[in-house]
Amino acid sequence: MTNPHFAWLPPEINSALMFAGPGAGPLLAAAAAWGGLAEELASAVSSFSSVTSELTSGSWLGPSAAAMMAVATQYMAWLGAAAAQAEQAAAQAAVTAGAFESALAATVQPAVVTANRGLMQVLAATNWLGFNTPAIMDIEAAYEQMWALDVAAMAAYHAEASAAASALAPWKQVLRNLGIDIGKNGQINLGFGNSGTGNVGNNNVGNNNWGSGNTGSSNVGTGNTGSSNIGSGNTGNSNVGLGNLGSGNVGFGNTGNGDFGFGLTGDHQFGFGGFNSGSGNVGIGNSGTGNVGFFNSGNGNMGIGNSGSLNSGLGNSGSMSTGFGTASMSSGMWQSMHGSDMASSTSLASSATYATGGTATLSSGILSSALAHTGGLNPALAGGLTPTAATPAAAAPAAAAPVAAAAADAGPVSAGANSGSTAGAGLRSPAAGYSGLYNSANSDAGARSVATREAPANAGAGIPRSSFYPNRETADSEADIQLPLRTE
């Protein structure tokens, strides 16, 4: 280190760091371990040399024996170099331990530094009229001396430890000098067949790969191609899983970018592949873009069975519909729009132009009708209670059945003035032709068609007559009201 950090650290920190560690014990243990390894390697060299010499000098002769002996000689040379390296490591570890012990002895005790600082605080707190100034100066001088002693001890320790470490030969250099190649081309690779730097495993090409057969950088797994992949068989960058093709995929067998799931095709998909088609869909059976739910087609739909754009609900078609079975820009249930002027209606079970039955256009409510449309329960806009001024006359049987109050047009579409097949009348109509409920017409009768009261003997037509009042004819209608006649 050019400028060790301990040079500007106070003695409180340097002393505490030196005395807080385990001391020279680990270094001495390492030196002993390296020494033991050196002895074992030297013994292995001696034993292997003896065995190979016996083989090549007696029972094993010929070219194969010579080839084996050449390789064995290299191996014995490596064992000898390793033994020497281990012995040197043991010696340097012992030197480093000695340097630490020397530095520790030269370092000021932490308790002494703490006492100095405590006394300084007391003197400064009781320095009335400057009486403690000389003592404070002495305490500060002693503190500065402690600082210098700690820095000197650490500097000496740093120099000796650096010299001991620089004397060690790297193990990679020892193996390279011996001519032994075990497939580690590059630097700091661990394994076989690696090419690059920082690879751990086998047959990796690139840098910082963990696993086998990776091509690229920072891959973890097997057979990845690209960078920062985690898993197996990924092609691209930043994939997590198996067999992904693209970048940023999480799962298995995804093709695209940013997919999360299994077997997805496209970008930013979520779910299981084969169920959705398009981009940005979430759910099952969606086609298009940005759909959420099931069996939607189009763009931006949310729900089930929607078609179009920006719909939410069930079975909507068109754009921006909300509810169940609605059309464009509608909300509610079972709406349909066939004209540009029919948008934005809200009802329950309403229909569009030329609708017949229980509903009609531009109506809100339940089972209503309007605009010259007739329904199953209500007649048209100019309906039952308003008579028609120009009702055409039509012949009808004299004994026709009475027309009920709910009689309506027979055709699917009625005119604006209440016209049907023959223009039926309203609830009560004085006109000729087909009559209403009470009609004094000359053609088909209503429920009671006679304009005057019937005689008791002529029951069955007109308005029934009571025998409670005296029998008066039409000419007597202007007479005064008389008391009823008593009959026995």
UniProtKB/Swiss-Prot annotation:
Query: Taxonomic lineage per UniProt?
Result: Bacteria, Bacillati, Actinomycetota, Actinomycetes, Mycobacteriales
UniProt lists the family membership as follows: Belongs to the mycobacterial PPE family.
Superkingdom is Bacteria
Location (main, coarse) = secreted
Q: Which PANTHER family match?
A: GLUTAMINE-RICH PROTEIN 2 (PTHR46766:SF1)
Name used for this protein in its record: PPE family protein PPE10
Q: Which GO terms describe its biological process?
A: response to host immune response
Record's keyword annotation contains Secreted:
yes
Q: Does the keyword Secreted apply?
A: yes
What the entry lists under InterPro entries is as follows:
Mycobac_pentapep, PPE_dom, PPE_sf
Organism field: Mycobacterium marinum (strain ATCC BAA-535 / M)
What would be the name of the gene that encodes this protein? Answer: PPE10
What biological function has been recorded for the protein in this entry?
Plays a major role in the integrity and stability of the capsule.
Mind naming one GO cellular-component term on file for this protein? extracellular region
Observed phenotype of the null mutant: Mutants have impaired capsule integrity as well as reduced surface hydrophobicity. Mutants have reduced amounts of surface localized proteins and glycolipids, and morphological differences in the capsular layer. Disruption of the gene is associated with reduced ubiquitin association in cell infection and attenuated virulence in the early stages of infection.
What are the entry keywords? Secreted
Query: What are the start and end residues of every segment in region (Disordered)?
Result: 207-232, 443-488
Q: Where does this one sit in the cell?
A: Secreted
